[in-house]
Amino acid sequence: MLQPYRKMLIFAVVTVAFAMAVWSTPVPATPSGVGNATWANNSFNITRYDKITMGQVYSNTSNSPIFFVVISERNFRIVNTPLGASVFWIPKGAMNPPQHQPCVANGPEPGDPRGPCVNSTVSLLFNENVEPFLMSKNLLEFEVLPDTYITGWTFERSKTATTKSNPVGVVLSPPRGSPSANTTIRDDGGPKKPLSIIDEYTTLVADLQNFTMTLTYISPFAAVWPIEAFQTGITVMGCDTTQVVAYLGHGFMGLQISSVNNPPLEMIVVPNDVSARILNRRPSRLRLEPPGPHAGPIYKVYVLSDGNFYLGHGMSRISREVAAYPEESLDYRYHLSLANLDTLAMLAELSSGKSTDVSYYMYRIVARLAVATFSLAEVIRLSDYMLLQEAIDVDMNLRLIVPLVMKYAAGGAADSSYTSSDVAMDQFDVAQSQIEKIVSDINVEAELRKPMYEHRSLLRSVYAYSRKPLPNAVALADRLILAMYKEAIKDRITWNSTMREVLFFAVGAAAGSHVILTDEPEPGAPAHKDASLFLSLNRNILLLCTAMCTASHAVSAGLKLEEVMAGLVAGGVQFSLLEVFSPCMASTRFDLAEEEHVLDLLSVIPPRLYTDLNTGFEDDGTTIHSYGRSANGILNSRIAYNFDAVSVFTPELASCSTKLPKVLVVLPIFTNRSYVITRTAPSIGLTYSLDGVNIAKPIVISYITYGNCEVSRATIKSGYLDNPGHTQTCVYCGSVFMRYMVSGAIMDLIYIDDKEVELQLVAGENSTIPAFNPKLYTPSMNALLMFPNGTVTLMSAFASYSSFKVPSTYLWASIGGLLLAILILYIIIKMLCGGVTNDGYKLLLSYE
């Protein structure tokens, strides 16, 4: 039985011996320090294999048909094929030195589209990076190499790709700004003006000599020969399960996506006149390029994935989709907009309950973000300048979107995401130190008097370039959010784009990263001072955002999301997630996706949206209800945080081993103390159960203290509020007012932070805060007050008012009926009394 294999082995040995003779042919000497080919000597050994599979050997009429033989073990993916080994036949041409000139010798011309120098290094002996190609089995296991040419290896370009008449693709408005003499910083080796990190109109003029460092790109599949280009930067995204790296050069991008939970994907972008070369056993004249669409007017895109062989494979569809991205637009804003839109669609799909697997969004979103950085790098190369606002925009979007896609699409832990990019801002350390100095020098009280757009510029830079919370920035953020809260609870705030962005950046700048509780303290400060201050202020911000997330605001915010999703269904919109940012997205309310709140949202959707939201695939009611659930579900996402803010800022909830039931609301009301609202009673804390609430949706309020793992039950007592107007002391400060419905829906949670809010609480019908005005209550609404010491009291004033409130129509009808009854009674009495007085009965008797 071993005879065929013995013959095959002898044939392989003879072939190798013949190949050794060919190596004696004079070839250019290996440059010093180049190559790692100690295996190519006269003592080459072949290990004996019991089973060897040998593929077809192609002859080459134009060159010597001698091939070098490498034998490697492999696990066959074909069913019923035994474990064995493969014989790889590498063309002799791969032994020759590269045919192209060194890339460093041809520096790019400023602003010249022909500037990119991208070369494919097809060589073994003269290749410093040969080792991965000899040791890796990825080229087999991922099936990127075809044995024969297959249909679909080179596929048609997308309809959204650029054309010869429009080579740059879609360009958004407004047009890109031009450099200004007053705000331009030149990188020409001379004295430089200090970089103003908060002035969005600052322009950086690039020194192209800084981009002459070469990048050697090596395919992670070990399926494409190394590619050399001028390096411009690197973008990294990832978490504990996924890593995404984009290597960027002049006219070049190599994107690698690898994940524990999902198949890998690689995308390579080169100039349209460059041909990358794939490793296969074809002779040089038949050597394939990697798979991808046909070349475009500027670039050529290759894509490698697990689905290259299977046209109906999910990865095949994803590969063809992302391959179109680099050629859709050179405007980085276009790609950031679509990355934001895909993120919204991902959150909506998860919230609607239609799907729990949204991993395909990972490829789409991270590819968009990578292409955005590539597009910006190319625009910088072609224009020789960069606007500071472009750098901040890219970095801010990376920090906003990456944690969401890593958590929901890649399956990573909530606090394991990371991202960085040196494409837009290669002076990150300079920017970080400058923003820290600017913030340390500001006067918070004076800063508060500035307009909101200046707050946005400052906090935006802090959010983008400070990886730790800065004391003054946290204090400023807290004061700004408090000012918004004062207006929001009175329904006097206008949630325009500036207000939404200020709120988002304030929350993000205050929170920083979740490591703030263990960061080194500021110089000269006690070890615990900064951490306790940051914790206290962030707890207060959580509470204020929760209080701003009233039922009416949640409905209006949900309606805004409905309109965005209606536009998505109707044909697509381009936007930023910050355009729909809401206090609810930074709050500790987890109940907005419940049925009651969804129905509240659906009740106010304008009729014009019903046509847009109806896709025709479902019944109208089902479709509308699904979008309502999606909108409210998105409000439940805390997109301002790249970590689990509740667990970090409310450690008392995890101080005991007892696991809490599903939480509706968390109220960090005092240091190390929080109220938690649930549907079922937890086995920890002081617990209250509300009476008169739908038994299917009960409301349970628990007061949890850090380290106290005992459980006790208490009864909510009714009471009237004492009017504290005669004293300057704030009696109810630190308390939370809750308005709820007998159906079990929580309407409002108003935090009483000062005397002004306290006086509005007892003002009755004259209150300027709608939640405190009993005239706006219906018989199905009640209110209670949660004190910071753990006492909960039912507000009798609001309950009694609602109990005796009757419609005016019923009242007037009752009065009319009463008057009519009195009139009828009067007539009867008049008749009786009149007959007796006039002796009518006597006359009647006499007559008889």
Curated annotation (Swiss-Prot):
Residues 1-24 form the signal peptide. InterPro entries: Herpes_gH, Herpes_glycoH_C, Herpes_glycoH_C_sf. The keyword Lipoprotein does not apply. Residues 830-848 are intravirion. N-glycosylated, O-glycosylated, and sialylated. It is a single-pass type I membrane protein. Disulfide bonds: none annotated. Pfam families: Herpes_glycoH_C (PF17488), Herpes_glycop_H (PF02489). Its main location: virion. GO terms for biological process: fusion of virus membrane with host plasma membrane; symbiont entry into host cell. Residues 166-191 are annotated as: Disordered. It is found in: Virion membrane; Host cell membrane; Host endosome membrane. Keywords: Fusion of virus membrane with host cell membrane, Fusion of virus membrane with host membrane, Glycoprotein, Host cell membrane, Host endosome, Host membrane, Membrane, Sialic acid, Signal, Transmembrane, Transmembrane helix, Viral envelope protein, Viral penetration into host cytoplasm, Virion, Virus entry into host cell. The chain crosses the membrane at residues 809-829. Residues 25-808 are virion surface. Glycans are attached at residues 36, 41, 45, 60, 119, 182, 210, 496, 672, 766, 789. Residues 240-303 are annotated as: Interaction with gL. GO terms for cellular component: host cell endosome membrane; host cell plasma membrane; membrane; viral envelope; virion membrane. Belongs to the herpesviridae glycoprotein H family. The heterodimer glycoprotein H-glycoprotein L is required for the fusion of viral and plasma membranes leading to virus entry into the host cell. Following initial binding to host receptor, membrane fusion is mediated by the fusion machinery composed of gB and the heterodimer gH/gL. May also be involved in the fusion between the virion envelope and the outer nuclear membrane during virion morphogenesis. Interacts with glycoprotein L (gL); this interaction is necessary for the correct processing and cell surface expression of gH. The heterodimer gH/gL seems to interact with gB trimers during fusion. This is Envelope glycoprotein H. It comes from Equine herpesvirus 1 (strain Ab4p) (EHV-1).
